[in-house]
Amino acid sequence: MSVTKYSKPIRVFVHLAKGFDGRRWEKRWAAGQIIGINERLPYGYFRAAEDGCAVCYSEDKTKNKLEHLLGSLIMSIVGVDVLHAWRNRSRICTSDVVWTHTEIEYLAVLLLFRSLFWKRRPKLIAQNVWLFDRWQSFSGAGRFALSWLIAKADILTFLSLENLKAARSLFPNVRCEFVPFGINADEIPALMRKKAHRPLHVLSVGNDPHRDWPILIAAMRGLPDCYLKIASKKVKAKEIASCPNIELLNISSNDQFLAAFDWADILVVALKPNLHASGITVLQEAAVRGVPIVCTDTGGLRAYFSDEEIYYIPGNNPVEIQIAVMTLAADDELRFALAARAQERMKSGLLSSRCYARRHAELSRDLLAQETPSRAAELARKTAA
């Protein structure tokens, strides 16, 4: 990786979806209304200031009725919020590098670049989450249009090695990099040895579309000695109506969220096959809080945690969940060992938001360093003249 010293910070613009306005987020975070182990600003990108970046976030700007109608129309046609990017175009175009969190944002930025073709464009680090899971579902015309845009990204980044592999096969001429996701790991509570509750306290959390709730519910229905609490907007009360040992949580504050982890003996994350490391955020949150984890082995999660740190199971089989849950219920030492090793992994800092932001800073510096020789040559020519 090239490392170049700059006389001033790299100007970074983080373009996120509507609802992630930095100022509004910070107010909600301070009030404990951002659910999860989060940062004072979304995803901790601001931490790149420690690595020579001046970071600013996109703003949710008020739209009048006509703009709202236009934005909805464009969104229905192209599938991304171009108007949101347009309203942030000034700071996008005056930055050195634009960072995005998902394909929804970077595709909008690439469309903006195409529409402002006469303007200088900054570098773009384009992070992918769901796009390559869905790639085969797009029409030929859709894949062609996406490829036309993606070819103009400076770097495609991925939270999963599985996603990375798929992208490199489709876009061999575009630079693709694995950037491990990380959460705020500044405060990690001491891990306590404790006996399992009776009935066993089981927690499952998440809203990702690749959660396999039917399999988990089927597994827990057959385990009357376990009590499952689910924190998800994707599960309806009617789905658990016949399960007296399953409860839906209505979590409205971060204190309630953390209390659910403190209540749990184990966390279970049942997943459908995917490429994008579905579940990684909640796995890291559980590791920080010292909760042992059972998780489906899919999506490239082993790049984050090994089977020394997580009890991995095959997917699409409720019996495998039952075996894992009962194995951990009967073995206090195994639960403690898994939780301790996973927590040590988080303490290493390699899966922290600080490391995640630093990797973005390194990639940005590398992109800009590639321009330095030509800029220097141009300056030399002007000086000689």
Residue ranges of each PLM-predicted region?
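Acidic anion/phosphate-binding donor-loop and adjacent secondary structure
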Residues: 2, 165-168, 177-199, 239-240
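Short acidic/histidine- and often glycine-rich active-site loop of Leloir-type glycosyltransferases
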Residues: 239-240, 298-312
